[in-house]
From Swiss-Prot:
SUPFAM superfamilies: ATPase domain of HSP90 chaperone/DNA topoisomerase II/histidine kinase, DNA mismatch repair protein MutL, Ribosomal protein S5 domain 2-like. Belongs to the DNA mismatch repair MutL/HexB family. This is DNA mismatch repair protein MutL. It holds the Pfam family MutL_C. NCBIfam families: mutl, PRK00095.2-2. InterPro entries: DNA_mismatch_repair_CS, DNA_mismatch_repair_MutL, DNA_mismatch_S5_2-like, HATPase_C_sf, MutL/Mlh/PMS, MutL/Mlh/Pms-like, MutL_C, MutL_C_dimsub. SMART domains: DNA_mis_repair, MutL_C.
Amino acid sequence: MSIILLDPRTINRIAAGEVIECPASVVKELVENSIDAKATAISITIERGGRNLIIVSDNGIGIKKEDMEIAFARHATSKLPDGDLTKVRSLGFRGEGLTSIAAVGKVKMVSKYRDSDTAWLMVFEGGEKTQELTPDALSCGTYIEVRDLFFATPNRLKFLRTEKAEVQSIIDMMNKLAMVNHNVMFSLFVDNKQVFKYLTQQSNIDRLSEIKTLGMEFCKNSLPVNVKEEQIQLSGYIGSPTLSRGKSSLIYTFVNSRPVYDNLLIGAVRYAYSDFIEKDKYPVVVLYLDIPCDQVDANVHPNKSEVRFQDKKLVYRTVVNAIKEVLSINLNTKLKSISEFENDHFVHASMVNSRNIGNSVSSEFFKCFQNRKPLLNNDVQKYSSKNVETDDQSLLDTNVSFCTDSKMITNKLKEERVYENSREHINKGDSKIEVSNFDILGEKKNFVNLANNLLQESPSIDSGKFNTSKKVPSDSLIDTYPLGYALCQIHSRYIISQTQDSIVIIDQHAAHERLTYEYMKQVMAKEGIKRQILLIPEIIEMNNHLDLELLVEYKEKLLKLGLLIEPLGNLSVIVREVPALFGSFDVKSLIINIVDSIMEVGDTLFLDDKIKDICGTIACYSSIRSGRKLKIEEMNAILRNMENTAHSGQCNHGRPTYVELNLVEIDRLFSRR
């Protein structure tokens, strides 16, 4: 058969197959055009999931009469006047949207240009113009009506999902566009019922509070992000680890005001949260990246939902560092667990509150202790809290930051009194932590001793201050410590402590698990990761010279992480030493995954993740268990270590380690207020 040129109608229908995949694609193209037209109010109407009818109307600048017909021509656009793809700031630029919609549906468009006195009507069916340009009535902007979608390509109808599923796709897509355009009012009607109406807002967080999938729960449990790294501006909001979900659909990323789903960004977000949530969980995040147009390529796919970054490593590092920094500061927010508690039938929502206790201990409090040695170090007295100095670029970052809580310490005099009281207890103590035989990096079996080492740091029992025979501790002691003084243990699982104006309920296993994990990170960051020499070095054949060059380039960093490799010639490398923590594992698979990680994000993150996973598992199994009875001294040892430990608000799986109930709120429970 001879080769022939396809007719324009067939060409447009083929092209429409990529651009218009479903009704949500139609809505996306039309709404993006409205946003590019500077509309401040956009209305969408849907019938039967978009199969029968889609209407999008706006109050934008409209289309000139002379441009009405050419707007439906293939690759016709007003958004690339000089044809420079490195300067694309608009959502649309390919000139395929209207052409593709008209090729598969029946389209009626009415538009009035802002300086014109008359609106004009244009009608297309199956890619053919069926009515000449005629005057029509419209106050402003553009009105587009699409009926009988895919009537010209009936095979596509077979692959559409149920009406409810298609409507949900439209809602999800509209939510994304609304998140990044808070100054635009959006309304959606489905089968004559209004689904939502988002009013014009002053800020992104106000808009996020309107969106049902996020709502006030996210706003109350999120932390703001705002950093600039070289030419990248990153802003947005990151959810508390306790808001984690089982899928990544609530990780919203926007690049230059364009909603995108990018594996690099998703991976960066997950890595930043890896110390706080389970491996199979995803955080709730909304991030806005503003990057120079010449450093990002949006012309990857016709639906424009994918991008390519010129400097992937810079983007990845910016996202990871920004999220980690905010999580380390860990501002006071409301815990998801408390939100669930409020929904209980006997508790009014306003009666219970909590701090996200990740590090809700005042930074001012810990300034008093910055000259002391780190917890659990050899020959260190009880309650010392100087941070281990580490390389802040290390992926095993142990930088400890604390937020300032005015409720904790109200003035400088109180800080000094707290310091003097704490120093008095420390100086009077005569017991030291015995961990000289605890080789955290040598043999994994020794990790099981960490629980006992932690609990052996019991406070000095002098002057009756920590005397378990006293039923009620002194007010000065309660006032001294932000997490209070332990009173009892219930069900051999939870510690109850009393502060000056609240009670604190601590999950002993979750809290101790975080203490163990953070200690392991400190030791590894300070002393390095102990390596194990392979009895028989393993030779790995690389696929190509690029893979080999990448491994050689990152050789020194891999050595710091416990992996000693050397080039052997041709395409081979020899692995002589591996991290001792790993035990028995597939060396070749590890090397391949490391290379993939380097190629994807320019870093050895796969190896870092594997080390973190092993440390997390060891921390979980070596920590005190639920059901173990503790002495008052042991309970207080846990509390003091929590106050001095980063990220102690959540265990390694993202669960809260404690909740705090204010006395005022408890009084309300009993109708005392």
